[in-house]
Amino acid sequence: MLKSNSVYAAGGGAGSTPSRTAHVEAKKKTQAGWKKQNGKWYFYSSDGRKLTGWQTIRGKRYYLGKDGAKRTGWKKIDEKMYYFGKNGVMRTGWKRINGRKYYFGKNGVRSTGWRKIDGKKYYFGNKGVMRSGWRLIEGKWYYFGKGGALRTSQWIGNYYVNSKGEWVSQPSDVVRLNVKNILQRPELPMGCEVTSLTIALNYHGYNVAKGYLSDNYLPKGSSSSTSPDEGFLGNPRSWSSWYCYSAPIVTCANSYLESVGSDQRATDLTGTKFDNLLYLLDDGKPVVIWGTLSMGSPRTNGRWYVGGRSYPRYINLHCMVLTGYDKKKDLVYVADPLVGNVSYRLSTTRVRYAQMGSQAVVIR
């Protein structure tokens, strides 16, 4: 006999009615997504389950604890540190937190130690804080700029850091770089500056010819309207021309380097003490300098007056490339575009360099 309080679904057997099933499904749907319960946020799947662990929700990464609660702030997961914003989203890239800078990889892991980012090197302490200024790391001193990038191959005040970023207290006693010389003549009878630049560029792996640089990138002008600080006076291909100083050579070099998509640049070191150039050689970088022919005493023949300024007209000014030195022997090694690879007295070269305005250019 059928009891009056029993309910049978269509098709036979006791169970939920269609209306009850619809009610349950509707309840599940209302639970899907983020829900705040007792002050904490949880995420429910479409079937009503509370999710836990790593979850990607609408393209954002979250971490939900074992209890399903959304995590915010710092969180150590599998021995790695992550940071989640107030909204629970995992942070990546550069982030400033409580006044300190951190870097999180694409996977969200906080960086520590050395890290290369967008072509620059940075250092992060054990707690992930980006370092700046002078830092002693594994027994060596390094300098990091205000933005945190490691400084290399340059002077920081009175201290030199090499291409690895390491502070060099004193350059080696003897250095000799393997620099191939190029002669300026016959094509460029007056082109010692642009030929010296070509020597330096070739050393750094740029297959460029002296004539190409001279014709296409070297600023030029006449001695009546152009100073040697602005451009080459005349044309290096002409015997009746003069010379230029460091600035036009830097312009020439950087115009070329930009045209070939290089990240390297020429730096005008004019004013740098001669002995400080030895650090660059010790760092593997030849240096273009201005001196005199055979390091003889400077000789002039009148002056130029351009733009309200007076310039001595040197008749034995010469540009060459420093390729090494030997302190004990008082020698510098030079790639001279007029005579080839030669050596001069270091002490004499120091004086001539100063007399010619302490002009120097380096590629780095």
Predicted features by range, described:
Residues 197-206, 218-222, 254-262, 282, ...:
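Sec-exported extracytoplasmic/periplasmic mature domains
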Residues 45, 126, 291, 336, ...:
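Pocket-edge structural micro-motifs
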Residues 1-172:
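Extracellular adhesion/carbohydrate-binding repeat motifs centered on closely spaced tryptophans
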Residues 173-177, 190, 279, 284, ...:
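Long, domain-scale functional regions
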Residues 169-251, 293-295, 300-305, 310-314:
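Active-site-adjacent structural segments surrounding the nucleophilic cysteine of cysteine proteases
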Residues 303-307, 313-314, 320-364:
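Noncatalytic regulatory segments and standalone regulatory/sensor domains
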